[in-house]
């Protein structure tokens, strides 16, 4: 089955691949990444196309959940196994930790995100990156009444100056970056980071710098967040070590 419309319109640092295990899958363009494909893999795929091959271990953690939640969880594990295979790692089981975080094989860092339509996964050898974080969001889901809990005063002031459509998109972008950063930092610190503890600073059309009020503030200063549209109504945020992306002028 084809990718949904939002994934068929590929983000500019993605390309669509047809064939092999990546049938109907959108994966990273590797001339945008300073790492070989054997060390770093990222992909986006429709949830409905990530249901097989599945294992009982994919279902056990969500056995009592509603069907939609089961499908989302399974999609993350199915796609993650495919990407791990691409970097030479055979992992039948990707369990969940106490905070529902994926427990990756030794030597691997990774991140999984999904919404109601699509699943995004990034995996890498920990010899080439410190950590990774990914998040995909539907534009418009961050209601204005949530801003005080999510954004710094500076971020809120910036949002208030925007027109409604741009405001809705940028609020989603800021939220998505902070979600991706949380996933990046958690395997390192094993600690909680609040949304307002992280400040996001736009650098150009698609990249953002971060600062954070956490015990190891260098974690934020050493990363770069890349954000790209997925069709007309979604965004995907990737947080990686700042040395990983080649600098792109994406408009």
Across the structure, where does each feature detected by a protein language model lie?
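Core catalytic alpha/beta fold that binds nucleotide/phospho-ligands
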Residues: 2-132, 136-251
């Amino acid at each position: 089955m084809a990718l949904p419309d939002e994934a068929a319109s590929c983000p500019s640092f993605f390309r669509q691949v047809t064939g092999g295990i990546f049938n109907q899958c959108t994966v990273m363009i590797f001339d945008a990444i300073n790492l070989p494909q054997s060390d770093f893999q990222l992909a986006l795929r429709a949830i409905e196309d990530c249901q097989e091959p599945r294992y009982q271990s994919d279902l056990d953690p969500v056995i009592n959940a509603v069907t939609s939640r089961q499908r989302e969880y399974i999609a993350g594990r199915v796609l993650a196994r495919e990407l791990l295979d691409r970097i030479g790692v055979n992992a039948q089981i990707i369990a969940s930790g106490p905070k529902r975080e994926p427990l990756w094989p030794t030597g691997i860092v990774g991140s999984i995100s999904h919404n109601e339509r699509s699943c995004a996964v990034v995996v890498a050898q920990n010899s080439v990156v410190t950590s990774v974080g990914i998040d995909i969001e539907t534009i418009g889901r961050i209601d204005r009444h949530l801003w005080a809990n999510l954004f710094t005063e500076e971020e809120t002031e910036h949002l208030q100056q925007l027109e409604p459509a741009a405001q809705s998109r940028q609020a989603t972008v800021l939220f998505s970056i902070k979600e991706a950063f949380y996933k990046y930092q958690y395997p390192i610190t094993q600690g909680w980071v609040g949304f307002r503890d992280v400040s996001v600073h736009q650098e150009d059309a698609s990249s953002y710098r971060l600062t954070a009020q956490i015990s190891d503030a260098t974690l934020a200063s050493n990363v770069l967040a890349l954000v790209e549209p997925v069709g007309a109504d979604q965004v995907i945020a990737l947080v990686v070590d700042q040395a990983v992306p080649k600098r792109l002028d994406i408009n």
